[in-house]
A protein has these predicted regions:
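Active-site microenvironment of metallo-dependent hydrolases
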Residues: 1-269
Length: 269
């Protein structure tokens, strides 16, 4: 009821959230209540999916204005970290598996190059407005050897990159830009997997089965390059949302959400 009846009542969505005469027949049929494996999905009384496969024909139209929305500035030489001041420590975004909250770590500059658990995170303004690029550090993605890219980055949906190699980060950025937006995994100069999202850089125009297959390939590729997160692109998508504690990054730089201030990468001791 917490996921069905209660929300429907809270938002006064009459006819939703329950199984009774007069209610819309939006139903799930599950194998059992422990594993909660979904076998059938009904929408308005019609069978919509069986064992994870969507059954309805899919058609859709979208305006030309939501195409060609990725306009990147020059990247060369702009995805490196600023040089640290003497005796400075770096503000590092620490992510947690399956959570959108982050922690702010302070790591001495001398320890950064020696750590294989840190990666660069960059936000690149992609709407052709100001050409901003901000670069920081992130911990929690695992021991990456390559780069991840995504144009899904709440709420401004700029391009976000996480990686350990500058050339791989640039290639990942070019890959999603050429597709009109999307997700990509790159390592050692090769694109291992990608999913084009040409509708505003946020949505695919492919059928659900194709999107599901490509999304699974992305996750497998991310694991192959050392990513330890179960949902890396979901985690990435919230790193640029500067309203959730503690530390975020936008195209204007790092944001200390507890103070609602833009802060430098390097903090003096």
């Amino acid at each position: 009821q917490m996921a069905t009846l209660h929300p429907a009542r809270h938002y006064n969505l009459r006819g939703l959230g329950g199984i009774a005469p007069g209610y819309q027949a939006d139903l799930l049929v599950v194998s059992d209540l422990s594993s909660f494996r979904i076998e059938l999905v009904f929408k308005a009384g019609k069978l919509a999916a069986r064992e994870g496969r969507y059954l309805w024909a899919q058609t859709g139209k979208y305006a030309k204005s939501v195409s060609n929305t990725v306009h990147l500035p020059e990247l060369q030489g702009r995805l490196s970290l600023e040089k640290p001041a003497q005796n400075a420590g770096a503000r590092v975004i620490e992510v947690q598996p399956e959570q959108i909250l982050t922690k702010c770590l302070i790591i001495p500059a001398a320890e950064i190059d020696a750590s294989d658990e840190l990666a660069r995170v960059a936000v690149v303004e992609r709407h052709g407005k100001n050409g901003n690029i901000a670069v920081g550090l992130v911990k929690g993605f695992g021991r990456l050897k390559g780069a991840l890219a995504s144009t899904v980055a709440h709420d401004s949906h700029n391009l976000i990159l996480v990686g350990t190699d500058t050339q791989d980060m640039e290639l990942a950025a070019r890959t999603v830009a050429a597709a009109g937006g999307g997700l990509a995994v790159v390592s050692e100069g090769r694109v291992l997997a990608s999913l084009a999202l040409p509708v505003a850089g946020l949505m695919s125009n492919e059928d659900a089965d194709t999107v599901s297959r490509l999304h699974e390939e992305l996750h497998r590729a991310a694991q192959r390059i050392g990513c330890s997160l179960p949902s890396p692109f979901m985690t990435m998508s919230f790193l640029a949302l500067p309203v959730i504690p503690e530390l975020r990054i936008t195209d204007f730089g790092l944001v200390d959400v507890t103070k609602f201030e833009i802060v430098d990468l390097w903090k003096q001791k």
